[in-house]
Amino acid sequence: KRQACGGSASSAASSAAVSEVASSAAASEEEETAAPLSATEPLRIAGLKGPTTMGLVNLLSMEQAGTAAMDYDLQLYGAADEIVPLLIKGELDMAAIPANLAATLYQKTSGGIQAVAVNTLGVLYVVEQGDTVHSTADLKGRTILSTGKGTTPEYVLRYLLTANGLDPDKDVDIQYYSEATEVTAQMASTQDAIAVLPQPYVTAAGLKDDTLRVALDLTAEWDKVADTQLITGVTVVRKAYAEEHPDVVAAFLADYAQSVNAANTDLDGTAALCEEQGVVAKAAIAKKALPNCNIVCLTGEELKADVSGYLQVLYDADPAAVGGTLPGEDFYWAAQ
């Protein structure tokens, strides 16, 4: 299993951007003169409530401690479709969004969006009240409550159902809700409910209702039928911003690697920040969920290999999942 970059057990294939920035930062510290960044305004970055933003929150404590390379304006949204227009209009510089949505946006903006990092691997689980689901095939004939129509949960679920011989449109009844909190509320009032939920909502639902059982880990199910990583989220940048401020993007990735490392090692501090920022309702939920959230910071060649492999699987299943065609080489940001 790969470690988040920036930690003591960093992957050997960690981004050149991060290592270059780290070494140049160390050199500039020795001289006590760090070159000013090309952008003076805070970096405007949006995230969704839940795992894709849990790796970002430590940027705020780093900023307060004076150890961040820049100031951050972290904005939180409930659904990805709230972020898209802001990114397109240039009212955001970066965003942490579902991987397939990043590919779709790349098509919509004629290459105006670039991926800079994978931020989250698999976080989806099937939960149920009872003990009836032990394989994907057991979902036949059932109603499944889920979030994420048009993003990762829908496409992962459809892919897994199809790979296990089920027709997603005929053999199951998938009901979509805009936010995970709606799914958990619906589960509480529905008998024999089955839901696809991401962490940390799996943990939150389990703490509220001890009859809930994690029936399937969809990452494990994915690994049985696909030879690529299951990727939940990527962090993207507007290409125009990246071209104007490549130094800021590289400095962000160095900060981000530290933030992700803290999310995986300082559970108490990260959990408190998650509650404070509204990323997760309660620190206790965040702390319990963090080890299961697969928060990473994969950049450079790892980013390209993992995301392109994942998008290929989605494309082969349904080209619409990635915006009709696979993104070109320029979709993957690399340090110049």
Locations of regions flagged by a protein language model:
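Conserved C-terminal helix/tail region of periplasmic/extracytoplasmic solute-binding proteins
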Residues: 308-336
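Short, glycine-/small- and polar/acidic-enriched structural segments
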Residues: 18-21, 32-169, 175-176, 193, ...
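Short, solvent-exposed loop/beta-turn-alpha elements that line the ligand-binding surface or hinge
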Residues: 63-71, 220-228, 295-304
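Bacterial lipoprotein signal-peptidase II cleavage site
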Residues: 2-14
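Second-shell loop/turn segments in exported
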Residues: 43-45, 88, 92, 142-147, ...
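A bilobed periplasmic-binding-protein/Venus flytrap-type ligand-binding module shared by bacterial periplasmic
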Residues: 58-60, 124-135, 230-248, 299
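Pocket-lining segment of extracytoplasmic ligand-binding domains
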Residues: 100-101, 109, 182-273
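Secondary-structure end/capping motifs
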Residues: 242-317
